[in-house]
Regions:
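Long, acidic (Asp/Glu-rich), low-complexity accessory segments flanking structured domains
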Residues: 231-250
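Alpha-helical interface subdomain recognition
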Residues: 1-94, 98, 104, 116-121, ...
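Short glycine/proline-enriched turns and hinge-like loops at secondary-structure junctions
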Residues: 79-80, 148-151, 175-180, 193-196, ...
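A short, Trp-centered hydrophobic/proline-enriched beta-strand micro-motif
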Residues: 132-141
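A short core secondary-structure module
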Residues: 163, 167-211
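Short Ser/Thr-interspersed hydrophobic loop/turn segments at strand-loop and sheet-helix junctions
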Residues: 64, 87-92, 186, 202-207, ...
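Flexible, small-/acidic-enriched active-site or ligand-binding loops
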Residues: 152, 205-236
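Short Gly/Pro-enriched turn/cap motifs at secondary-structure boundaries
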Residues: 129, 144-148, 172-175, 189-191, ...
């Protein structure tokens, strides 16, 4: 967003503390209203039944919350990564499972294609992703390639005339069971290791592609996850993204942006946990008075507030820095270190926030059907996905020592 910073007196105290401009606050508030009205009512059934609401993405697209970073000529909003992070923050408050699917579609697939695909590929695939007619996903992780996703990658692609033929499998793929378009990484020159990886646009309708199994998760239920199989999957040669054997640049740049975009999801969940805990503390009575009157509960609420605000500051700082990431950039240097630090801190701190939130709720927090339990079951993923906490520490330390 390029809106100039307004005078401080025209802004509320929350904006002053967060550093949001009026235009940015409007993006956050509008997304919050939409998510509360349209997405929150879906959250309980999504968790209970592992249900995917097929109407959700078309509705989100019609409302203008897909293709945030895409140009208007493709149907997008023409905004920046920071605005996209604000939308994710709002969605995370009200339906964190759908927010996870949204960011896999919006950032891992759509924005990745926007940054790396050719103009012809963008014209072919982005409009349907922006409208919500198609769901997007990214295929990187494999059964034997998690933290070592590049070095241990086994999925291959060989050239056969006007097609590439993919063989292998991908695991833990968000949106996998419902995706129409996927950005998939495969080794085109296996002897070159990580330097022999290429990126491809794969349609779920291509021969040889199938969903092997839908995976049932502890948390983020309703956000669909699957193992995908490529069995002589024929992909048109025109669907190679960028240059052959240069996919590692797409991977590393995308991972830094992915980490920058996990933190706003953590922030939204943390904000909701604090709000729900405040409401519970005010209404739950023991010993003839609200438990909010007890100093131990007040201590937990104070700790939660401090941690939420710390996540907010770090998240916004990182999003603003990631706004300037050039195409093909990242995977090294200050932004690589910062995005790893941001998501490590946000996920770890969110864990502390939710631990206090469940304790405030007491027995109710341990019951599956409560909202706070729904949040608590989900947050472990954020210490695993987009690089585990341990990998994040390796990145941070590596950049420190190189400096």
């Amino acid at each position: 967003m390029s809106a100039s910073q307004p005078a401080a007196e025209s802004r509320n105290s929350a904006q002053v503390f967060s550093g949001l401009s009026d235009a940015e606050q409007e993006v956050l508030d509008a997304a919050d209203r939409f998510a509360r009205q349209e997405l929150y009512p879906l959250s309980r059934r999504m968790d209970d039944e592992e249900w995917w609401p097929p109407q959700a993405f078309p509705l989100i697209g019609r409302t203008g919350y897909l293709g945030i970073t895409a140009p208007p000529e493709l149907g997008g909003a023409g905004m920046d990564l920071f605005a996209s992070g604000l939308v994710l923050q709002a969605f995370g408050r009200w339906n964190h499972a759908l927010a996870l699917s949204w960011v896999a579609h919006e950032n891992l697939c759509l924005n990745n294609l926007l940054r790396n695909a050719s103009a012809a590929q963008a014209r072919q695939y982005l409009p349907a992703l922006i409208s919500g007619a198609h769901v997007g996903a990214l295929g990187l992780t494999e059964p034997g390639a998690g933290s070592d996703a590049l070095g241990s990658m086994r999925t291959t692609a060989r050239r056969d005339g006007d097609h590439w033929v993919l063989n292998g499998s991908k695991l833990y793929i968000t949106n996998g069971p419902v995706a129409d378009v996927l950005l998939v990484y495969a080794k085109t020159s296996p002897d070159k290791g990580a330097q022999g990886i290429s990126a491809f646009i794969v349609e779920s309708a291509f021969p040889g592609f199938r969903v092997a199994q839908k995976l049932v998760k502890m948390g983020f239920r309703g956000s669909q996850t699957a193992e995908l199989v490529f069995d002589e999957c024929r992909v048109p040669a025109a669907n190679l993204v960028g240059e052959e054997d240069r996919g590692v640049r797409v991977v590393m740049s995308g991972l830094d942006l992915e980490r920058a975009m996990v933190a706003p999801l953590c922030l939204g969940i943390a904000e909701r946990a604090l709000a729900v805990s405040l409401e519970y503390a005010r209404t739950r009575k023991q010993f003839g008075q609200p438990i909010a009157n007890f100093q131990m509960i007040q201590s937990k609420l104070a700790d939660m507030y401090v941690r939420v605000e710390a996540i907010r500051v770090f998240t916004y700082q990182t999003l603003r820095a990631a706004n300037d990431l050039e195409i093909g950039g990242g995977g090294r240097g200050g932004i690589h270190q910062l995005t790893a630090a941001s998501v490590m801190f946000a996920a770890d701190t969110l864990n502390q926030v939710l631990d206090d939130a469940v304790q405030i709720h007491g027995g109710a927090g341990y019951i599956w059907e409560t909202e706070i339990n729904r949040l608590y079951r989900s947050i472990k993923l954020l210490e695993i996905g987009a690089g585990t906490t341990e990998v994040r520490k390796i990145i941070i330390a590596g950049e420190l020592l190189r400096g």
